[in-house]
Structure formats: structure tokens, C-alpha cells
């Protein structure tokens, strides 16, 4: 009996022990690992994973590998190596690993964010990029859409003058409407039941993905009851049902001679493909309703929670750093005033604000670890071999907190992005990739940067953002899920006296 058990264990150890494709090649240093469970017993059990991986660099260097279950994962924590993965060898490493929870979220690896490299991903990314080109000029100009929603946001916040509130939901509404207008040309009024549905499923999905699930490391575990997995499936179904409803209603009013949003772009591509008017890379099978809905879901999901979270981080850091906030008020008062609202062109004048946004994206990156990549071919990173199928994680936290690259990296210092005179924005380090880079870079970077700048410029022009009367400051610890979230906090909103006086003068 025991001999049989021992034989079975030896067989499993042989089957699951990592095998090198190139026996003579030099591979990254590796944590200890065991058959089946890999390096899991040897990883730190407390603290955030991105920080734990960063600490391991002191022992293993800026590139090392771990066995996550039965899969080899290479951790990259230096900007030169990261750029080799993302840019120089971007095609080699543009794949996505197959992960149980992400398969559910992406309707079995459709869409853009979690789809593997291939014709489908290339097509949908290209069509999404084409959508953003629609919003460069005219009535559909991106800036105009953003400012319309920010104006509504400011009007709503003004009704809470002198009150202490959580700004999460109001900011969520504004950003959701911007994305919704880009995706299918509709916006929601505050109190719309669909808006609550979007908010609830969004929170549910992020919460589910934030729980480190063993089923992602051991997919065979999905045959057993799993509350987190069931919760994720439930919220994804709610999302899919809502998007399907919007899609079906939209089909009735679609006109191929009026392309104004992402759904139009995708539907036109599908129609052209069905009619044989598309190129060879535009297979109609890759433009099924399910493919289209997943791509819309990707843009809708990724574009909302990320920007909402960064806005809250900015406000939180300003509450902790009143001297920076004071300088921002002075900068806006001197360069914009109160006779007009801020515009994107003010970026050249509101340098400290732009530097503040950049610093927040450094010190609290949207994703401390980028979505895992996968090697499509046998390749290398630096001097080390990387086998086909290897998972690669860029530890953005390590890049943004490297003491050799950043002076006092754990300190909030917007001035690091300005020259000594404060008259010019600078790039103090190459170790800065807040939106990733290369083929898998964030396609919504331009949108996100515009939203962050305009939202903060408008808020600071109109409102004093103050610590609540109870003195409770936001926690800056954060909660890294699929997005680096900040714990809920409240801020005291007061309409600025200078703004009120300017408005009173303008109305007389």
C-alpha cells in the first residue's frame, strides 16, 4: 500500500516538476519549489503581494522566477528589463495566461484586456483605437464630453456645500457617463436604476477578482463549490445581461452612415465582414455578438474603476499634504481664475497639478502589478532564457519605488516632476510606466489623463477640499485588487468664496 502511494507521489513529482526546454540555457534565479504546490509554501504569507515581490528582489535580483502552482512565473522589477518585455520584445511577450477567474470575466478569453495574442485580439484592439479617433474634433470632442459630465458633477457637489461626504459615487457617475457616451452614446441621470446595476456589478467583480483564489493556480479545483467563483459568475452575468439589453435596443437604430461611438464601429465592422467587404483579418466569427459585448465590457469596466480610484487617491494625498493643496489653489487662481472653466490647454499652465497627478500615478499605480503576460515563443529577458508559455509579471510597484531611481520613493513629492524653478515638467526617471507600454499598453491612456486633469482642475477651482471636522484622514495603505483601491473616506466640501463671488458678479 505505502509503496503504491510513494510510487504515485514520485510519478506526480516527475510530471509536474518544471522541465527546461533548453537544458544548457541560463534561467533566472528561482525560489524554492515543490511538486504540485510550487513556491507557494515559501512565499510571504502577510502583506501585499507587490510589496513582497519587491522585497524578494533584494535576495534574488531584479528578475527571478517562482512556481505558482504548476506554472513558472517570472517576476520583473527593473525598468530596463520591463521595457524589454513590453516594447523591445513586445510581440514575444504579448500573450495572456489562461486564468480561471479571468476566463469567466472575459467570456472565455474574448475582448481585449484578457484575450490571448492572436487575430481576434489584434482586430478588437484596432477597432477600439479607431473609436477614440472619432472623438478628436467637433461636437464629439473628448474634452467637451468630459467637461459636460464634470459640470454636472460639480453642480451636484455644490448641493453638499459645507457637508462631509464620500465622493466615490458622484465621481463614479461622471466617469461612467463619459465611458458610456464613448461606448454607446448614452448617459445616465443620477438615480437611474441602470446606474446602480453598473455600480453593483462593478464592485462585485472587482471584489471577487481581488480575492487570491487557489482556483487560478489549480484550475481543477473549479469542480468543487466555490463561493467566490459563484459570486463572480453572478456579477458577470448581470453585466452581460445589461450590455445585451443595451446592444439589442441599439441594433434597431444603428445606421452605417452615422458612426459615432464604439458600438457603431464594432457593428459596422461586423456588417462589412458579413457582406464580404472587409479585409482578410476581419473574420465575421471574431465579431459575434458575444465578442462585441465582451470588448464593450472591457472598455466600460477598465475605464471606470481605474480613473475613479485615481481621483480618490489624488484627493486623499492632498488632504494629507495641505501645503501642496495650497500651492495648487494658487496656481489655478493665477493661471485660470474664475471667469472661465479649465481646459486641456491649461496643462501648459497648471504644471504643479500635472506633476501632482503624475506623482500619484507613481506612488499608487493603478495596478501595482501589470496584468500577467505570457511568452508566445522561446525568448529571453536580459541574459536569461524564458521558455514559451512562461508567465511574466511586471512589478510596477518595484519600478516606481526603486530607491536608486527615485529620491525618497515612499514620500509624496510632486515637485520631483518639475525642474527646480517649477517652470517645466520633467521626467526624473525612466522607471515610470503608469499605463504600461508596448502592444499591451492601456488604450485609454489619453482619455484617462484628460479626465484626471480636468476633474481635478474643475474641483480645485470651485471647492475647498478639507479634512472632516473629526480630523479623520484617509488611509493611504490601499487595497490592491485588480485595481489599487483606496479605502472609503470622507472629505468636507465647501464652495470656494472666490468662486461664489465671481459667479455673483457674472450674473449682475
From Swiss-Prot:
A cytochrome P450 monooxygenase involved in corticoid and androgen biosynthesis. Catalyzes 17-alpha hydroxylation of C21 steroids, which is common for both pathways. A second oxidative step, required only for androgen synthesis, involves an acyl-carbon cleavage. The 17-alpha hydroxy intermediates, as part of adrenal glucocorticoids biosynthesis pathway, are precursors of cortisol. Regulated predominantly by intracellular cAMP levels. The 17,20-lyase activity is stimulated by cytochrome b5, which acts as an allosteric effector increasing the Vmax of the lyase activity. It is found in: Endoplasmic reticulum membrane; Microsome membrane. Belongs to the cytochrome P450 family. It catalyses: a C21-steroid + reduced [NADPH--hemoprotein reductase] + O2 = a 17alpha-hydroxy-C21-steroid + oxidized [NADPH--hemoprotein reductase] + H2O + H(+); progesterone + reduced [NADPH--hemoprotein reductase] + O2 = 17alpha-hydroxyprogesterone + oxidized [NADPH--hemoprotein reductase] + H2O + H(+); pregnenolone + reduced [NADPH--hemoprotein reductase] + O2 = 17alpha-hydroxypregnenolone + oxidized [NADPH--hemoprotein reductase] + H2O + H(+); 17alpha-hydroxyprogesterone + reduced [NADPH--hemoprotein reductase] + O2 = androst-4-ene-3,17-dione + acetate + oxidized [NADPH--hemoprotein reductase] + H2O + 2 H(+). Pathway: Steroid hormone biosynthesis; Steroid biosynthesis; glucocorticoid biosynthesis. One of its GO terms (molecular function) is iron ion binding. Keywords: Endoplasmic reticulum, Heme, Iron, Lipid metabolism, Lyase, Membrane, Metal-binding, Microsome, Monooxygenase, Oxidoreductase, Steroidogenesis. Heme binds at residue 442. Its cofactor is heme. This is Steroid 17-alpha-hydroxylase/17,20 lyase. InterPro entries: Cyt_P450 (IPR001128), Cyt_P450_CS (IPR017972), Cyt_P450_E_grp-I (IPR002401), Cyt_P450_sf (IPR036396). It is an enzyme of class 1 (oxidoreductase). The gene is CYP17A1. The keyword Iron applies. Pfam families: p450.
Amino acid at each position: 500500500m505505502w509503496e503504491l502511494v510513494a510510487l504515485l507521489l514520485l510519478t506526480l513529482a516527475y510530471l509536474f516538476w518544471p522541465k527546461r526546454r533548453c537544458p544548457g540555457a541560463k534561467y533566472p534565479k528561482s525560489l524554492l519549489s515543490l511538486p504540485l504546490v510550487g513556491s507557494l509554501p515559501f512565499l510571504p504569507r502577510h502583506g501585499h503581494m507587490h510589496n513582497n515581490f519587491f522585497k524578494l528582489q533584494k535576495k534574488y535580483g531584479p528578475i527571478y522566477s517562482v512556481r505558482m502552482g504548476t506554472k513558472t512565473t517570472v517576476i520583473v522589477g527593473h525598468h530596463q528589463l520591463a521595457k524589454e518585455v513590453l516594447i523591445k520584445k513586445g510581440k514575444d511577450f504579448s500573450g495572456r495566461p489562461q486564468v480561471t477567474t479571468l476566463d469567466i470575466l472575459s467570456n472565455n478569453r474574448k475582448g481585449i484586456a484578457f484575450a490571448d495574442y492572436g487575430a481576434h485580439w489584434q482586430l478588437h484592439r484596432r477597432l477600439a483605437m479607431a473609436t477614440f479617433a472619432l472623438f478628436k474634433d467637433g461636437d464629439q470632442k473628448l474634452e467637451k464630453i468630459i467637461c459636460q459630465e464634470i459640470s454636472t458633477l460639480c453642480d451636484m457637489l455644490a448641493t453638499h456645500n459645507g457637508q462631509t461626504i464620500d465622493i466615490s459615487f458622484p465621481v463614479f457617475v461622471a466617469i461612467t457617463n463619459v465611458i458610456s457616451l464613448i461606448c454607446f452614446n448614452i448617459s445616465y441621470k443620477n438615480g437611474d436604476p441602470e446606474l446602480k446595476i453598473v455600480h453593483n456589478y462593478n464592485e462585485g467583480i472587482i471584489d471577487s477578482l481581488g480575492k487570491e483564489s487557489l482556483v487560478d493556480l489549480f484550475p481543477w479545483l473549479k469542480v468543487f463549490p466555490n463561493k467566490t467563483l459563484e459570486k463572480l459568475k453572478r456579477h458577470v452575468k448581470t453585466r452581460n445581461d445589461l450590455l445585451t439589453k443595451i446592444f439589442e435596443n441599439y441594433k434597431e437604430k444603428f445606421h452605417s452612415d452615422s458612426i459615432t461611438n464604439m458600438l457603431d464601429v464594432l457593428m459596422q465592422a461586423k456588417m462589412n465582414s458579413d457582406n464580404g467587404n472587409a479585409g482578410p483579418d476581419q473574420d465575421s466569427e471574431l465579431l459575434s455578438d458575444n465578442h462585441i459585448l465582451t470588448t464593450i465590457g472591457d472598455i466600460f469596466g477598465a475605464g471606470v474603476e481605474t480613473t475613479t480610484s485615481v481621483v480618490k487617491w489624488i484627493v486623499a494625498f492632498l488632504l494629507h499634504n495641505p501645503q501642496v493643496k495650497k500651492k495648487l489653489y494658487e496656481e489655478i487662481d493665477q493661471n485660470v481664475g474664475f471667469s472661465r472653466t479649465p481646459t486641456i490647454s491649461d496643462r501648459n499652465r497648471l504644471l504643479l497639478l500635472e506633476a501632482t497627478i503624475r506623482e500619484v500615478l507613481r506612488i499608487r499605480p493603478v495596478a501595482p502589478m501589470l496584468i500577467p503576460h505570457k511568452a508566445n515563443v522561446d525568448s529571453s529577458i536580459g541574459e536569461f532564457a524564458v521558455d514559451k508559455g512562461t508567465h511574466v509579471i511586471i512589478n510596477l510597484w518595484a519600478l516606481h519605488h526603486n530607491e536608486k531611481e527615485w529620491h525618497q520613493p515612499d514620500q509624496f513629492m510632486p515637485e520631483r516632476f518639475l525642474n527646480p524653478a517649477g517652470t517645466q515638467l520633467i521626467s526624473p526617471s525612466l522607471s515610470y510606466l503608469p499605463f504600461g507600454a508596448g502592444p499591451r499598453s492601456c488604450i485609454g491612456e489619453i482619455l484617462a489623463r484628460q479626465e484626471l486633469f480636468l476633474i481635478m482642475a474643475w474641483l480645485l477651482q470651485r471647492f475647498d477640499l478639507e479634512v472632516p471636522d473629526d480630523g479623520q484622514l484617509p488611509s493611504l495603505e490601499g487595497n490592491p485588487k485588480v485595481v489599487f483601491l483606496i479605502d472609503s473616506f470622507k472629505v468636507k466640501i465647501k464652495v470656494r468664496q472666490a468662486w461664489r463671488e465671481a459667479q455673483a458678479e457674472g450674473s449682475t
